[in-house]
Amino acid sequence: MRRWLIVLSTVLIAAATHTATDVAAPRAWAGDAPIGHIGDTLRVDTGTYVADVTVSSVAPCDPPPGFGYTRSGVPIKSFPGSTPNRADVTVRAVRVPNPFIMATAFSFTGVTPYADAYKPRTTDAPDDLDNVLVNAPNGAIVRGGVYWDAYRDPVSNVVLLDRKTGHHLAQWNL
């Protein structure tokens, strides 16, 4: 009886391993995404739209209007020196099917040296990148800011992700 139990468990484990290796893993797009340094203009081509994107700087800033709660100054939830960060981003729409496609697709994530990722915070600032990308027809050049609440470590990489699929579109290293 014990021998049959061992044989049965071995067969089940082998079948599960074989099934797991046959399942198609999602394609990793990070190898296809351009990687550059701050100030480099990177071409983002998804097949649906093409844009030239430049992240020119990342620096601490005062909280913009509508930023909401910040963790700075709260000893339990923040580290000393934590503050909102702002990235200056310039986007040139090379080929877009409609003027607002990049506003619905772009998500700039700030990543720390220890792999903490900060999602962009929506603000009421007039130069917020989400606000200016709403009207970016072919050939338009728009410039705006992306804001993060960097409550642990400072941002060392800016990663452009597709908001809908999560694909890695571009990356800038500081």
PLM region spans:
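Secretory targeting and sorting signals
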Residues: M1-A25
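Conserved functional micro-motifs across diverse proteins
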Residues: V7, A24-R86, R92-L174
